[in-house]
Amino acid sequence: MSIMDIVNNKADAYFYIEKQLPDDVRDAGRRCVKAFDVKSRFIHFEFFRLNKDMPGVANKGEIIALEVNMRPSGGFTPDMLNYANSTNVYKIWADMIAFDRCTLSEYADKFYCIYVGRRDCNPHKNAHNEILSRYRANITMSD
């Protein structure tokens, strides 16, 4: 489901942080950094992997860029990146500006992290409080 579908259909939203970026996504990101000559900026890119051929655009399985943003991701995404990678993305950004390198140690612990945004207008099998009472030990943040 696309962001446009979520907005237009008032659908619930979800996404997750991968433990490891696929090589083609990492390569596309690095090519974007080079193409835009980005230095010491907090950036984020948004790519989609096509689930069907789109003649004139790309083939099924290939990635296409949606956005190149010269700012941090929105919402809870920076917190999710921190948790999933046992890191601090804002400290990394500050280090790039101040020292032109990262001073944080690389941590081995990596986790999956998922965001789920439920709309009040949609029916749900379980109420928010029921989910919290059942899974609180596995939920890092809830709003």
Regions found by a protein language model. Give the residues of each.
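Peripheral (often C-terminal) accessory segments that flank ATP-dependent C-N-forming ligase machineries
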Residues: I92-D143
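ATP-dependent carboxylate/phosphate-activation module, predominantly the ATP-grasp catalytic core
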Residues: M1-V38, F42, A58-K60, N69-I97, ...
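Conserved protein kinase catalytic/activation segment
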Residues: M54-I64
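A short glycine-rich, hydrophobically flanked beta-strand micro-motif that places a catalytic Asp/Glu
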Residues: K39-K52
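Short, conserved beta-strand edge motifs with alternating hydrophobic and charged residues
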Residues: H44-E46, A65-V68
